Amino acid sequence: MPSFETDNLDYLGLTALRERLKSDLNSLLYPGKNWVPPRNGVTDTVIIGGGMCGMVVWLSLTTGGMRNIRVLDRAVEGHEGPWVTYARMETLRSPKNLTGPAFGHGALTFQAWYRAQFGAAEWEALDKIPRVMWMDYLRWYRDTLNIPIENGVSVDRVEPEGDLLRLTVSGSTTDTILCRKLVFATGRDGIGGPNIPKFITQLPSHLWAHSANKIDFSVLKDKRVAVIGVGASAIDNAAEALEAGAREVRHLVRRAEMPT
Protein backbone atom coordinates (compact mmCIF):
# COMPACT_ATOMS: atom_id res chain seq x y z
CA MET A 1 0.00 0.00 0.00
CA PRO A 2 1.61 3.30 -1.04
CA SER A 3 2.42 5.93 1.55
CA PHE A 4 1.50 9.60 1.39
CA GLU A 5 4.18 12.07 0.30
CA THR A 6 5.49 12.64 3.81
CA ASP A 7 9.27 12.62 3.47
CA ASN A 8 11.63 12.46 6.42
CA LEU A 9 8.97 11.52 8.95
CA ASP A 10 10.38 8.19 10.06
CA TYR A 11 11.46 8.14 13.71
CA LEU A 12 11.20 11.92 13.80
CA GLY A 13 9.51 11.84 17.20
CA LEU A 14 6.30 13.58 18.18
CA THR A 15 7.99 16.71 19.50
CA ALA A 16 9.78 17.29 16.19
CA LEU A 17 6.61 16.43 14.25
CA ARG A 18 4.75 19.07 16.23
CA GLU A 19 7.40 21.65 15.36
CA ARG A 20 7.19 20.66 11.70
CA LEU A 21 3.43 21.13 11.72
CA LYS A 22 3.81 24.48 13.47
CA SER A 23 6.25 25.61 10.78
CA ASP A 24 3.86 24.49 8.03
CA LEU A 25 0.98 26.37 9.66
CA ASN A 26 3.07 29.51 10.06
CA SER A 27 3.87 29.39 6.34
CA LEU A 28 0.14 29.39 5.65
CA LEU A 29 -0.41 32.41 7.94
CA TYR A 30 -2.34 30.28 10.42
CA PRO A 31 -4.48 31.21 12.21
CA GLY A 32 -6.34 33.37 9.75
CA LYS A 33 -6.89 37.05 10.47
CA ASN A 34 -9.91 37.62 12.66
CA TRP A 35 -12.53 39.29 10.46
CA VAL A 36 -15.72 38.84 12.51
CA PRO A 37 -17.02 42.01 14.21
CA PRO A 38 -17.28 41.31 17.95
CA ARG A 39 -20.56 41.52 19.86
CA ASN A 40 -20.43 41.96 23.61
CA GLY A 41 -21.38 38.77 25.46
CA VAL A 42 -21.82 36.77 22.26
CA THR A 43 -19.79 33.75 21.13
CA ASP A 44 -19.45 33.60 17.35
CA THR A 45 -19.64 29.80 17.11
CA VAL A 46 -20.29 27.06 19.63
CA ILE A 47 -19.33 23.52 18.66
CA ILE A 48 -21.10 20.77 20.59
CA GLY A 49 -18.72 17.84 20.64
CA GLY A 50 -14.96 17.80 21.08
CA GLY A 51 -14.26 14.53 19.33
CA MET A 52 -12.71 14.03 15.90
CA CYS A 53 -15.35 15.98 13.94
CA GLY A 54 -15.65 18.78 16.48
CA MET A 55 -11.90 19.32 16.45
CA VAL A 56 -11.60 19.50 12.68
CA VAL A 57 -14.52 21.96 12.57
CA TRP A 58 -12.60 24.12 15.07
CA LEU A 59 -9.47 23.88 12.90
CA SER A 60 -11.44 24.83 9.78
CA LEU A 61 -13.03 27.88 11.40
CA THR A 62 -9.77 28.99 13.01
CA THR A 63 -7.96 28.66 9.69
CA GLY A 64 -10.65 30.84 8.13
CA GLY A 65 -10.14 33.61 10.67
CA MET A 66 -12.71 32.92 13.37
CA ARG A 67 -11.37 33.15 16.92
CA ASN A 68 -14.39 33.54 19.17
CA ILE A 69 -15.23 29.83 19.30
CA ARG A 70 -16.18 27.53 22.15
CA VAL A 71 -15.98 23.74 21.95
CA LEU A 72 -18.09 21.86 24.51
CA ASP A 73 -17.98 18.16 25.36
CA ARG A 74 -19.68 16.36 28.22
CA ALA A 75 -16.97 13.70 28.47
CA VAL A 76 -13.93 13.93 30.70
CA GLU A 77 -10.76 15.04 28.93
CA GLY A 78 -9.23 12.36 26.74
CA HIS A 79 -12.43 10.29 26.55
CA GLU A 80 -14.33 12.20 23.88
CA GLY A 81 -16.16 10.01 21.40
CA PRO A 82 -16.58 6.23 21.50
CA TRP A 83 -12.98 5.10 21.12
CA VAL A 84 -12.12 4.32 24.75
CA THR A 85 -15.64 4.29 26.16
CA TYR A 86 -18.16 2.00 24.47
CA ALA A 87 -16.35 1.06 21.23
CA ARG A 88 -15.10 -2.49 21.70
CA MET A 89 -13.65 -3.55 18.35
CA GLU A 90 -9.89 -4.13 18.37
CA THR A 91 -9.24 -1.93 15.33
CA LEU A 92 -10.92 0.74 13.25
CA ARG A 93 -12.85 -0.68 10.31
CA SER A 94 -11.78 2.00 7.83
CA PRO A 95 -8.54 1.78 5.80
CA LYS A 96 -5.46 3.14 7.55
CA ASN A 97 -4.55 5.55 4.73
CA LEU A 98 -7.64 7.76 4.92
CA THR A 99 -6.55 11.29 5.77
CA GLY A 100 -9.01 11.62 8.63
CA PRO A 101 -9.19 15.01 10.38
CA ALA A 102 -5.87 16.30 8.95
CA PHE A 103 -7.56 19.15 7.01
CA GLY A 104 -4.94 19.06 4.26
CA HIS A 105 -1.87 18.99 6.52
CA GLY A 106 0.36 15.97 5.93
CA ALA A 107 2.08 16.38 9.30
CA LEU A 108 -1.31 16.16 11.01
CA THR A 109 -2.29 12.78 9.54
CA PHE A 110 -2.35 9.55 11.52
CA GLN A 111 0.29 8.23 9.15
CA ALA A 112 2.68 11.04 10.08
CA TRP A 113 1.96 10.50 13.79
CA TYR A 114 2.59 6.76 13.44
CA ARG A 115 5.70 6.95 11.29
CA ALA A 116 7.28 9.61 13.49
CA GLN A 117 7.26 6.99 16.25
CA PHE A 118 7.64 3.63 14.50
CA GLY A 119 8.98 4.24 10.98
CA ALA A 120 7.87 3.44 7.43
CA ALA A 121 8.40 -0.32 7.64
CA GLU A 122 6.04 -0.62 10.60
CA TRP A 123 3.54 1.58 8.79
CA GLU A 124 3.59 -0.65 5.71
CA ALA A 125 3.14 -3.72 7.92
CA LEU A 126 0.18 -2.20 9.77
CA ASP A 127 -3.19 -3.52 8.64
CA LYS A 128 -5.90 -1.60 10.49
CA ILE A 129 -5.42 1.15 13.08
CA PRO A 130 -5.78 -0.11 16.67
CA ARG A 131 -8.76 1.57 18.30
CA VAL A 132 -6.99 2.78 21.47
CA MET A 133 -4.05 4.03 19.40
CA TRP A 134 -6.48 6.12 17.36
CA MET A 135 -7.59 7.82 20.57
CA ASP A 136 -3.95 8.47 21.46
CA TYR A 137 -3.56 10.17 18.08
CA LEU A 138 -6.66 12.31 18.64
CA ARG A 139 -5.32 13.37 22.06
CA TRP A 140 -2.06 14.40 20.39
CA TYR A 141 -4.06 16.26 17.73
CA ARG A 142 -5.88 18.24 20.39
CA ASP A 143 -2.75 19.00 22.37
CA THR A 144 -0.69 19.93 19.30
CA LEU A 145 -3.27 22.39 17.98
CA ASN A 146 -4.09 23.63 21.50
CA ILE A 147 -7.81 23.21 20.94
CA PRO A 148 -9.67 24.78 23.90
CA ILE A 149 -12.22 22.04 24.54
CA GLU A 150 -14.36 22.60 27.63
CA ASN A 151 -14.87 19.13 29.08
CA GLY A 152 -17.64 18.13 31.44
CA VAL A 153 -20.08 20.59 29.84
CA SER A 154 -23.49 19.48 28.55
CA VAL A 155 -25.90 21.48 26.40
CA ASP A 156 -29.37 20.90 27.83
CA ARG A 157 -31.49 23.29 25.77
CA VAL A 158 -31.24 25.52 22.68
CA GLU A 159 -33.64 28.42 22.15
CA PRO A 160 -33.76 31.27 19.63
CA GLU A 161 -33.22 34.78 20.97
CA GLY A 162 -33.62 37.33 18.22
CA ASP A 163 -30.99 36.59 15.58
CA LEU A 164 -28.97 34.59 18.13
CA LEU A 165 -29.22 31.28 19.95
CA ARG A 166 -29.21 30.86 23.72
CA LEU A 167 -27.79 27.60 25.02
CA THR A 168 -28.67 26.36 28.49
CA VAL A 169 -25.68 24.39 29.75
CA SER A 170 -24.54 22.47 32.81
CA GLY A 171 -20.98 22.04 34.01
CA SER A 172 -19.80 25.43 32.78
CA THR A 173 -18.95 28.64 34.64
CA THR A 174 -22.23 30.16 33.41
CA ASP A 175 -25.71 28.70 33.03
CA THR A 176 -26.25 29.98 29.48
CA ILE A 177 -24.23 30.84 26.39
CA LEU A 178 -25.37 33.26 23.70
CA CYS A 179 -24.02 32.47 20.23
CA ARG A 180 -24.37 33.39 16.57
CA LYS A 181 -23.91 29.91 15.12
CA LEU A 182 -24.17 26.41 16.56
CA VAL A 183 -22.46 23.33 15.15
CA PHE A 184 -23.55 19.85 16.23
CA ALA A 185 -20.56 17.49 16.15
CA THR A 186 -22.17 14.93 18.39
CA GLY A 187 -21.45 11.79 16.39
CA ARG A 188 -23.85 8.88 16.74
CA ASP A 189 -25.20 10.30 19.99
CA GLY A 190 -26.71 13.11 17.95
CA ILE A 191 -29.22 10.82 16.24
CA GLY A 192 -31.05 10.08 19.50
CA GLY A 193 -30.93 7.70 22.42
CA PRO A 194 -30.85 3.90 22.49
CA ASN A 195 -33.96 2.13 21.22
CA ILE A 196 -34.65 -0.27 24.09
CA PRO A 197 -37.91 -2.27 24.20
CA LYS A 198 -40.08 -1.75 27.29
CA PHE A 199 -39.97 -5.41 28.23
CA ILE A 200 -36.20 -5.04 28.60
CA THR A 201 -36.26 -1.86 30.69
CA GLN A 202 -38.66 -3.57 33.13
CA LEU A 203 -36.03 -6.19 33.95
CA PRO A 204 -33.60 -5.76 36.87
CA SER A 205 -30.73 -3.55 35.69
CA HIS A 206 -28.06 -6.15 36.48
CA LEU A 207 -29.56 -8.51 33.90
CA TRP A 208 -29.19 -6.33 30.82
CA ALA A 209 -27.15 -3.54 29.24
CA HIS A 210 -27.09 -1.52 26.05
CA SER A 211 -23.98 -1.78 23.89
CA ALA A 212 -23.20 1.90 24.60
CA ASN A 213 -23.17 1.32 28.36
CA LYS A 214 -20.14 0.70 30.51
CA ILE A 215 -20.20 -3.09 30.91
CA ASP A 216 -18.26 -5.29 33.32
CA PHE A 217 -17.78 -8.29 31.05
CA SER A 218 -16.09 -10.31 33.79
CA VAL A 219 -19.49 -11.00 35.39
CA LEU A 220 -20.51 -12.86 32.22
CA LYS A 221 -18.03 -15.66 32.80
CA ASP A 222 -19.79 -19.05 32.51
CA LYS A 223 -23.08 -17.28 31.69
CA ARG A 224 -25.40 -17.72 28.72
CA VAL A 225 -25.76 -14.38 26.96
CA ALA A 226 -28.37 -13.19 24.46
CA VAL A 227 -27.52 -10.30 22.13
CA ILE A 228 -30.48 -8.57 20.47
CA GLY A 229 -29.35 -7.44 17.04
CA VAL A 230 -26.55 -8.33 14.68
CA GLY A 231 -25.04 -4.96 13.78
CA ALA A 232 -21.44 -3.96 14.34
CA SER A 233 -21.83 -3.16 18.03
CA ALA A 234 -23.73 -6.41 18.58
CA ILE A 235 -20.89 -8.44 17.08
CA ASP A 236 -18.25 -6.49 19.02
CA ASN A 237 -20.02 -7.02 22.33
CA ALA A 238 -20.64 -10.69 21.61
CA ALA A 239 -16.93 -11.18 20.96
CA GLU A 240 -16.08 -9.30 24.16
CA ALA A 241 -18.42 -11.55 26.16
CA LEU A 242 -16.89 -14.71 24.71
CA GLU A 243 -13.38 -13.45 25.38
CA ALA A 244 -14.44 -12.80 28.99
CA GLY A 245 -15.46 -16.44 29.35
CA ALA A 246 -19.18 -16.48 28.55
CA ARG A 247 -20.37 -20.05 28.07
CA GLU A 248 -22.61 -19.19 25.14
CA VAL A 249 -23.68 -16.13 23.14
CA ARG A 250 -26.76 -16.15 20.92
CA HIS A 251 -27.85 -13.40 18.55
CA LEU A 252 -31.58 -12.71 18.27
CA VAL A 253 -32.29 -11.27 14.82
CA ARG A 254 -35.61 -10.33 13.20
CA ARG A 255 -34.35 -10.75 9.65
CA ALA A 256 -34.47 -14.08 7.89
CA GLU A 257 -30.84 -13.64 6.80
CA MET A 258 -27.76 -11.83 7.96
CA PRO A 259 -27.74 -8.33 6.40
CA THR A 260 -24.93 -7.69 3.93
Q: What is the predicted role of each segment?
A:
Residues 4-8, 72-135, 252-260:
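Glycine-rich active-site loop/strand segments that organize a redox cofactor
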Residues 13-35, 130, 186-245, 249-251:
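Glycine-rich dinucleotide-binding loop and its adjacent helix/turn
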Residues 38-70, 226-244, 249:
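N-terminal Rossmann-like FAD-binding beta1-loop-alpha1 element of flavoenzymes
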Residues 42-44, 152, 221-223:
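Phosphate-coordination loops involved in phosphoryl transfer and adenosine-cofactor binding
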Residues 53, 77, 189, 233, ...:
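Conserved Rossmann-like nucleotide-cofactor binding loop
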Residues 131-149, 155, 185-190:
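Helical element adjacent to the flavin cofactor pocket in flavoenzyme catalytic cores
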Residues 151-165:
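A conserved short coil-to-beta-strand element within the FAD-binding core of flavoproteins
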